[in-house]
């Protein structure tokens, strides 16, 4: 069995020199957490299996700023790096990989133009193409109400999962399960799956969402949104069937250091690199 991965996520505000890491609740209520290069170095030294940088400012004008951050990071950080936010064209993939990233994640641009996935995977390889899916529950009274959505029975009732774009500011009506399947068919190598309902809440991942996506694609799924303690990460693997768990605030604010989380998982017989 492949080892599960622990992935710190750095949401980067690049409107200031060198950038700063922030964290919100349900994509709002922003707190500042530190310098991206310094935090990435800290997490690498603690044993992070991968590090995700998300540019929340996501503008072409600041592409060079993110590239600078990545170039400085990889001078001392030797673990896989994924960059997301503002990845709109194949040339953006190329620029970030040239700066030192190993993967690029895109959400809005792929939904607006799904062929981007085909073109990017052909140009840089599927292993470098991560699709971010930011999903929110939409409840229905009757599972037969909609033929166009993948309906899931949860503890709170029947629902489907709606894909959002533009950092959660706009909903598309696109079913997240069907979209994940299409992304894999087009050449995506991984899904970065965030629950908008759980983001920053620390009440645990949306396990129904994670499990449903994981069972419908064969590529790795990264669970994101809602982790508050090591047990939540354990649940993402044991119940949610995720391949990796992404977390932010529990690491940024030193609530649960990465070594503590990994030792907890090891004691629970989860295959993990120590």
Swiss-Prot record:
Disulfide bonds: none annotated. Keywords: Amino-acid biosynthesis, Cytoplasm, Histidine biosynthesis, Lyase. The active site is at 11, 134. It catalyses: 5-[(5-phospho-1-deoxy-D-ribulos-1-ylimino)methylamino]-1-(5-phospho-beta-D-ribosyl)imidazole-4-carboxamide + L-glutamine = D-erythro-1-(imidazol-4-yl)glycerol 3-phosphate + 5-amino-1-(5-phospho-beta-D-ribosyl)imidazole-4-carboxamide + L-glutamate + H(+). The keyword S-adenosyl-L-methionine does not apply. Pfam families: His_biosynth. One of its GO terms (molecular function) is imidazoleglycerol-phosphate synthase activity. Its EC number is 4.3.2.10. It is found in: Cytoplasm. InterPro entries: Aldolase_TIM (IPR013785), His_biosynth (IPR006062), HisF (IPR004651), IGPS_HisA/HisF (IPR050064), RibuloseP-bd_barrel (IPR011060). GO terms for biological process: L-histidine biosynthetic process. Pathway: Amino-acid biosynthesis; L-histidine biosynthesis; L-histidine from 5-phospho-alpha-D-ribose 1-diphosphate: step 5/9. GO terms for cellular component: cytoplasm. HAMAP family: HisF (MF_01013). Heterodimer of HisH and HisF. IGPS catalyzes the conversion of PRFAR and glutamine to IGP, AICAR and glutamate. The HisF subunit catalyzes the cyclization activity that produces IGP and AICAR from PRFAR using the ammonia provided by the HisH subunit. Belongs to the HisA/HisF family. This is Imidazole glycerol phosphate synthase subunit HisF. It comes from Methanosphaera stadtmanae (strain ATCC 43021 / DSM 3091 / JCM 11832 / MCB-3). The gene is hisF.
